[in-house]
């Protein structure tokens, strides 16, 4: 650990700063962090065995998380902002045909509630429309699957990144266009974001 500024000379630099899950920006997400709010179904799903959970998102990741959680929970609500899923056709079919998953299209999560942890989510259906509807849905767990932000901001003036911020490497190699600089793990991996692939 370096306190303050220090210049270090090295023959190579490996950037492995990871990626951080995106949140909705609700104050309640911080309040219930570790008490019902999670951004990793494979990490925390087992806490919700035979319980009711909600997953926020409409892409492949959200659908995968919903299917995974459906193997543990008694009920999974998939909260989708749009009137359709953005996931691949096969993932859409898995979700829509799963008896434990209910998709709530055109819904926005606007808050969470509970005394000692998450006990429910406040929803708005068809936000801003004449038939807008607000209601509360009892749940035990709230999972976010709306993407990740790579922790690459401090390198953007020196290293090429894609439009999201993932560091661009040379194909399957960790090499960047800057000689001696490599990127490993989630900061350069927009697809898998798992410890096993980050370590590989």
Where are these regions (language model features)?
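Nucleotide donor/acceptor-binding cores
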Residues: 12, 35, 50-52
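N-terminal Rossmann-fold NAD(P) dinucleotide-binding loop
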Residues: 62-63
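Generic hydrophobic/aromatic pocket-lining and core-packing "Φ" positions
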Residues: 66-67
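A Rossmann-like FAD-binding core segment of flavoenzymes
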Residues: 1, 7-8, 15, 71-171
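FAD-site-proximal beta/loop scaffold in flavoenzymes
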Residues: 20, 25, 30-47, 145-193
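An active-site-proximal "capping" alpha-helix that borders the catalytic cofactor pocket
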Residues: 196-200
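Glycine-rich Rossmann-fold phosphate-binding loop(s) that bind the pyrophosphate
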Residues: 57-59
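Phosphate-coordination loops involved in phosphoryl transfer and adenosine-cofactor binding
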Residues: 49-51, 106, 178
């Amino acid at each position: 650990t370096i306190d303050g500024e220090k210049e270090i000379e090295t023959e190579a630099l490996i950037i492995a700063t990871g990626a951080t899950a995106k949140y909705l920006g609700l104050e309640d997400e911080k309040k219930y962090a570790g008490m019902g709010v999670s951004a990793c179904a494979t990490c925390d799903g087992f806490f919700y065995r035979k319980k009711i959970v909600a997953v926020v998102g409409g892409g492949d990741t959200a659908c995968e998380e919903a299917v995974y959680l459906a193997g543990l929970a008694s009920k999974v609500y998939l909260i989708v902002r749009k009137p359709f899923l953005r996931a691949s056709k096969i993932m859409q079919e898995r979700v829509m045909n799963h008896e434990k998953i209910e998709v709530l299209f055109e819904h926005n999560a606007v808050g969470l509630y509970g005394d000692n942890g998450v006990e429910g989510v406040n929803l708005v259906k068809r936000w801003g429309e004449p038939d807008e509807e607000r209601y509360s849905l009892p749940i035990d767990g709230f999972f976010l699957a709306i993407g990740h932000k790579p922790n690459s901001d401090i390198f953007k003036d020196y290293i090429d990144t894609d439009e999201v911020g993932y560091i661009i490497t040379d194909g399957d190699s960790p090499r960047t266009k800057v000689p001696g600089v490599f990127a490993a793990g989630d900061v350069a991996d927009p697809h898998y974001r798992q410890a096993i692939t980050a370590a590989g």
